[in-house]
Amino acid sequence: MEIIRGAPALSAFRVQQLMKACDAAAIPVRHIYAEFMHFAHLTNALNDTQTLQLASILTYGPAIEAHTPKGQLYLVTPRPGTISPWSSKATDIAHNCGLSQIKRLERGIAYYVEADTLDASQQKALQALLYDRMVEVIFDDMAAAETLFDRTEPKALASVNVLGEGRRALEVANSRLGLALAEDEIDYLVDNFVRLKRNPNDIELMMFAQANSEHCRHKIFNADWTIDGVVQDKSLFKMIKNTYAVTPDNVLSAYKDNAAVMTGSVAGRFFPDETGVYAYHVEPCHILMKVETHNHPTAISPYAGAATGSGGEIRDEGATGRGSKPKAGLVGFSVSNLNIPGFIQPWEAQYGKPERIVTPLEIMLEGPLGGAAFNNEFGRPALVGYFRTYEQEVSSHNGVEVRGYHKPIMLAGGLGNIREDHVQKGEITVGAKLIVLGGPAMNIGLGGGAASSMASGQSSEDLDFASVQRENPEMERRCQEVIDRCWQLGDDNPIQFIHDVGAGGLSNAFPELVNDADRGGRFNLRNVPSDEPGMSPLEIWCNESQERYVLSVAPENLARFEQICLRERAPFAVVGEATSEQHLTLADSHFNNKPIDLPLEVLLGKAPKMSRDVVSKKALSPALDESQITVDEAVTRILSLPTVADKSFLITIGDRSVTGLVNRDQMVGPWQVPVADCAVTAASFDTYAGEAMSIGERTPLALLDFGASARMAVAESIMNIAGTDIGSFKRIKLSANWMSAAGHPGEDAGLYEAVKAVGEELCPQLEITIPVGKDSMSMKTAWEDNGVHKSVTSPMSLVITAFGVVQDIRNTVTPELRSDKGDTALLLLDLSHGKTRLGGSCLAQVFSSLGDVAPDLDDSTTLKGFFEVMQTLVADQSILAYHDRSDGGLFTTVTEMAFAGNTGAEIDLSALQGSDLARLFNEELGAVIQVSQAQAEAITAQFIAAGVACHAIGGLTEHNKLVVKDGSRVVFQQQRSELRRLWSQTSYKMQALRDNPDCALEEFSLKQSETDPGLTVKLNFDPSQDVAAPYILKGIAPKMAILREQGVNSHVEMAAAFDRAGFESRDVHMSDILSGRISLDEFQGLVACGGFSYGDVLGAGEGWAKSILFNQRARDEFSRFFERDLSFALGVCNGCQMLSNLKEIIPGSEHWPRFVRNRSERFEARVSLVEVQQSPSLFFEGMAGSRMPIAVSHGEGLAEFASMQAMTAAESTGTVALRYVTGTGEIATQYPQNPNGSPNGLSGICSTDGKVTIMMPHPERVFRTVANSWHPDNWGEDSPWMRMFRNARVKLG
């Protein structure tokens, strides 16, 4: 084993954060230093050249000064017997660089802690801060790392002696293994194994428990119900299915696959053909939709729980039909009170929590990062979400009790596209190969399905922790590329049937795969790829290692499938084959036995059906006492409530531009304020048709009225999507995610009431279908605190996601108030007809009350009328701004619109009934629209004719104030900047705890500025002019290599941009270059695309670059290309980082910087303003001096020069091509206008001859005007960024 020191693992402020954590835990530490340590397992010794080569490969990150660390060593490494995702990717890079003697690379972090002697409890507390005990260990000396490469022998099978000891043996196993089997299930298993005349193996019991858990089988939703002694005629699931029975229109697949499918638009799907050439394929672009929850893992380990929640949902989408394409995501969180240190709010009572779960603050600091990181690395934009905090002692249907989200809701969902011929699963033929595609088995995530089906606190802490999975999004990206290549083959798609591997691991996925196709299967356990050779059969078969799919491929198509996988470097293995007999056999060649030998009907067939006999309860809660509440105090508290407040800290961490198909993300207007009501995507690059999605949830209302909460969730999702051009209710489909504390008094009957309200009544009346959903029935946390029994129970929680087919994405209306449209009016659309019910409102919450009566949708025809008029006005472009009334009431609606428009507003309440507080803060269904004064009267008449109350309530003002009047009486007035401070301070506090606090403060200050002009545009050319047109007319399309490496995710939009400019875009994988299948000699141009090559394990883009520099074939290819006279190259984001590390073979690039961690130490997704500099770059010919917004999405974009002299040289040679600037045109030095901290705002640079340009921002994602988060109204189809691609075409003549 060789040991190689690496770069510092923690920046100064990360060390400071760790020191603060030590201080909070009463660990007396004086200083901590941390650095990466690399361990190389060799088959034979390296020579001197190879040693230097390995040292170069492992040199990344900040430069390290030679020194000897001081203090006690805590060496954190992956758990011996495992292979980390870092290891597999770094080892791949080493092999691609020709270092075949390296059997494996592994990495750890050496923490050197200077402290006085720590006692055992302090040592334990310190270690808890330094490592993840599920996947890591701590050593106290370097030599111990040798055990990382020890090989352990497989553990043997265990059986349970049911024949000898009877039922008792199974009861003991149930508890020991955390199976969560019900009494009747234990009886069922005993009866079946007695009938089979053999004892069950532990693997069979775990498999049964996972496959039949509440999580997987949805027993409560399929149960028979008796309520208050009356037998109900329908199950919950039947009531949901009723929506499809009544309105099957536009539903292509429901209730039977990993996601539902609805009819989409006809568009030109853009992808490469079998020769690798990208082209448009005009066909139906159907929409798949799925929303999952990952609540239990997120409560235990927030980052991993949220990351694998997003990853699992993405796999569900990709595994729909015979393979499909995930497109855009959503995320949501409900947690108990944050209790931010130094910022605890008046309504936040300290109730405590059990030790085994983390705090709500930890969930919201770490969980969103996990979800965002997975989406970012996979390459899916996360475009919409919600965040609610709720924890309160209330008087509800059970008297006084604490309700809240100690068990959080972590929502992960999204939409994708699927070909018409692939919507339905195919037939698994007898003898078909049954394949696992993706990462290796690891001993993590055991029993997740059963664990998440229990109320928190019913299982042991070790079992809880064992049930959390770990993530590797770059692996999932590789798998998705394989699926993409398969569905792109159309009729020749080799995939017959596909499922994702989720709860229960292979033990659930393979039986489900064959059972759904009416087949059985013969499997070989030792064919399952594994990174832990010491695992038992149960651990191999039942673990929930992520990033895996199971699928069937006919034997005659196996060679083609293998070829695709090898090109994408996606691991796969044939684990079994399909049989005609519905029997499951798992052979173990190592022990020469059969761990599983069962008829499928025992596993999945006739398990006992659940019956629930429950009693309903009604809430009795006192009304909110308004007598001691002032409007000013209400405003201060409500704008600080996380449910209402600025959610920037949850949004800028997530890529919102990848794919180049995003039309509407969360950020609105020139000031990029996060107030969008919905997300909108384009169906493709050649159309204005698209898709929209929105979220609705009003969960606290359920504490007063279950049915009202459900109706309001559905209605809110409609209100949020109403500003898009959909046309008809029948073009909207809903996902329903139901969360409940089943068994808690009153909750079961309440759940039934809520499902009935939606499934039997409201949705059929609206002609809306719910073709997909999910349930989580254990939303309760119980624990003992010094002998006192405590519990926190969530409200019955329905989260609705609406998905719609958009006719014209250009017509989408946002909440941005327009001050450039002449005389305008603000109209309040009130669907409650004057009611001001405050029960369950944010106003009640921030004054520690629940209230008495909840708002409700009293008449579905009102919502229908509202939607129909809205659709007419949206299509006519008669509405300037739109925002629905929801959390925080009318005051919040208007205030957020003013923030988005950076303007003042004045509203008059005199047309409304009720107290000041009730009028301003009720959360009845409604919306505010801005219309031209000339049209206000006619629009008002349209709404009134449709049964919707409509009131003129005010307009914009010249001053930067929000003024509320009641006739002549001033009810409230305040500077917009002060309201923005109140609204954004929660986000600032969270950002300062999580990220670089200096950056957080700079952004918080900018938000309060009254002089910031926001995003501005200055163009020195005509973007509507197609300068490439004369050359395209020649009929010659120069060949462009769209270069990608494993983990790259921005290649399709790049290909589309060059295709539009007249190039022949060709898909080129690095494996094509390394294998010699493709030569760069064929191409005039090369573009290295953005993403996360190799998961950025050796620094962003550095592993990719080194696999070129240290591989002779690749080095020769690239060197020849760069030295050619008529070649050119572009590197964007990850491609920029990669090319910056190829300086030694790119002429004229010797002064280029490399790109390192952003100053904020966070992934930054922004719309930034850049100015084109005068430079020799062929891409920016004729564009100098132009200032334009552009998408930025990266974690390592800070330009770091080798020296001050190198930076001076780069500036003096005039090769700086782009700079970040402010809205007034100055070089941006402050965050976030300079999103990464690069010196002098540098964001792009070129070679001295202008042939090679590298840039961190993404022009390919915004080459269409509709793909920009904000743009001036007068831009046409092409945004100004299209010019740079056309300039390249012009250069070739």
Swiss-Prot record:
The active site is at C1133 (nucleophile), H1258, E1260. It is found in: Cytoplasm. Keywords: ATP-binding, Cytoplasm, Glutamine amidotransferase, Ligase, Magnesium, Metal-binding, Nucleotide-binding, Purine biosynthesis. Pathway: Purine metabolism; IMP biosynthesis via de novo pathway; 5-amino-1-(5-phospho-D-ribosyl)imidazole from N(2)-formyl-N(1)-(5-phospho-D-ribosyl)glycinamide: step 1/2. GO terms for molecular function: ATP binding; metal ion binding; phosphoribosylformylglycinamidine synthase activity. It catalyses: N(2)-formyl-N(1)-(5-phospho-beta-D-ribosyl)glycinamide + L-glutamine + ATP + H2O = 2-formamido-N(1)-(5-O-phospho-beta-D-ribosyl)acetamidine + L-glutamate + ADP + phosphate + H(+). GO terms for biological process: 'de novo' IMP biosynthetic process. The keyword Magnesium applies. This is Phosphoribosylformylglycinamidine synthase. Mg(2+) binds at D677, E716, N720, D884. Residues 1040-1293 form the Glutamine amidotransferase type-1 domain. SUPFAM superfamilies: Class I glutamine amidotransferase-like, FGAM synthase PurL, linker domain, PurM C-terminal domain-like, PurM N-terminal domain-like, PurS-like. It comes from the Bacteria. InterPro entries: Class_I_gatase-like, FGAR-AT_N, FGAR-AT_PurM_N-like, PurL_large, PurL_linker, PurM-like_C_dom, PurM-like_C_sf, PurM-like_N_sf. Phosphoribosylformylglycinamidine synthase involved in the purines biosynthetic pathway. Catalyzes the ATP-dependent conversion of formylglycinamide ribonucleotide (FGAR) and glutamine to yield formylglycinamidine ribonucleotide (FGAM) and glutamate. It holds the Pfam family GATase_5. Transmembrane segments: none annotated. ATP binds at G305, A306, A307, T308, G309, S310, G311, G312, E313, I314, R315, D316, A676, S886. GO terms for cellular component: cytoplasm. Its EC number is 6.3.5.3. It comes from Shewanella denitrificans (strain OS217 / ATCC BAA-1090 / DSM 15013). Monomer. In the N-terminal section; belongs to the FGAMS family.
